[in-house]
From Swiss-Prot:
It comes from the Bacteria. This is Phycoerythrobilin:ferredoxin oxidoreductase. It catalyses: (3Z)-phycoerythrobilin + oxidized 2[4Fe-4S]-[ferredoxin] = 15,16-dihydrobiliverdin + reduced 2[4Fe-4S]-[ferredoxin] + 2 H(+). NCBIfam families: PRK13248.1 (NF009721). Belongs to the HY2 family. Its EC number is 1.3.7.3.
Length: 253
């Protein structure tokens, strides 16, 4: 099933405009859709008690690029209690470019929002001053409207840049307004800047490529072992499917 034919392209899914912007912009750069195994590309399920069963939908969509992108994938979830857009671009390691990471999660009582150029090397080896200044300026503008969430632990923070947007909002009308307006604007600014940098980058030497491979693997292995979405996914789809999804699709190239 094409993701364009699912609920995730409809206005009643919270993140539909974000997903459309992603897919449209990646197509402009001649990215090619990557076939996802059918058991992960679309799934309907139910969760909750026998008396209060609720429906949940999941779709996984991915693309590659012949030179620039190893794998870019979106995981979308829709249910009465949860609405999720998780997106990751894994760039080709012949370019010294960070990951592009999005994790927008609507829980029963709150929204958790993360947007970043996530490093695969130490900050000083992957970000020049001009890029850091641009990111921090965009971040500060976003956080003039969206509150900054609590400080991340050192173990988690090492996988984020100084430009990370990290917010926690209550489930209320004001938050809906902030998501639809400020967050969407910041999301477009970050994605536009990322794709511009990725597609203008020059190839790096073999020594640095090896460092990039190791850095990417460290992050992907960490996420496979410590994915914070694991409990939510297990409660919605069961442990076996969740472990398979994490291992086979979410954090692999």
């Amino acid at each position: 099933m094409l993701i364009q034919d699912t609920i995730f392209y409809r206005p009643d899914w919270r993140w539909h405009n974000f997903l459309k912007y992603l897919t449209n912009n990646l197509s402009k750069y001649n990215c090619l859709e990557k076939k996802i195994p059918s058991e992960y590309s679309y799934k309907d399920s139910t969760y909750g008690s026998k008396k209060l069963k609720k429906n949940v939908n999941l779709s996984t969509w991915g693309v590659t690029h012949k030179k620039r992108i190893q794998f870019a994938r979106a995981v979308c979830i829709n249910s009465p209690n949860y609405s999720v857009l998780n997106f990751l671009i894994i760039p080709n390691t012949i370019y010294n470019v960070p990951f592009f990471g999005v994790d927008f999660v609507s829980l029963p009582n709150s929204h958790l929002l993360v947007l970043d150029f996530q490093p695969s090397l130490k900050i000083q080896k992957q970000y020049n001053n001009e890029l850091l200044e641009k990111l921090i300026k965009l971040k500060n503008h976003c956080h003039s409207s969206l509150p900054l969430a609590e400080k991340m632990s050192a173990d988690v923070a090492r996988f984020f840049s100084p430009g990370v947007i990290w917010s926690k909002l209550p489930k209320e009308e004001r938050s809906d307004f902030l998501i639809t307006n400020q967050l969407y604007t910041s999301f477009k600014e970050y994605l536009d800047l990322y794709l511009e940098i990725l597609f203008e980058s020059k190839e790096v030497n073999l020594e640095l490529q090896k460092e990039l491979i190791n850095g990417q693997n460290e992050y992907l292995n960490y996420r496979r072992d410590n994915d914070p979405a694991r409990p939510m996914l297990s409660s919605l789809f069961g442990k076996e499917f969740t472990e398979s999804l994490i291992e086979e699709v979410l954090f692999t190239t």
